[in-house]
Amino acid sequence: MKLTCMMLVAVLFLTAWTFVTANVSRNGLENLFPEERHEMMNPEAAKLNNRDCVKAGTACGFPKPEPACCSSWCIFVCT
């Protein structure tokens, strides 16, 4: 019984926390991610299209783990 009550309180707390921390609290979860919806309609505006990668011939690997090679092949030098 105690475990059930604790689980109920936890679920209610997490639900309330989601609504309190929403970007637009008047619409609840409906407008939680408005920017992403816009990016889905216009993929050219998406920030994910601008990949942060290293071009071919640049050193990569152990000393410099980031950013990754554009071709995703790294053998001490991006290929």
Swiss-Prot record:
InterPro entries associated with the record: Conotoxin
Name of the protein in question: Conotoxin Leo-O1
Family: Belongs to the conotoxin O1 superfamily.
GO molecular function terms noted in the UniProt entry: ion channel inhibitor activity; toxin activity
Subcellular location: Secreted
Record bears the keyword Disulfide bond: yes
Cellular-component GO terms for this entry: extracellular region
SS bond partners: 53-70, 60-74, 69-78
Keywords: Disulfide bond, Knottin, Neurotoxin, Secreted, Signal, Toxin
Chief localisation class: secreted
This protein's record includes keyword Disulfide bond: yes
Span of the signal peptide: 1-22
Pro-sequence residue ranges: 23-51
Tissue expression per record: Expressed by the venom duct.
Matches recorded under Pfam families: Conotoxin
Domain comment (free text): The presence of a 'disulfide through disulfide knot' structurally defines this protein as a knottin. The cysteine framework is VI/VII (C-C-CC-C-C).
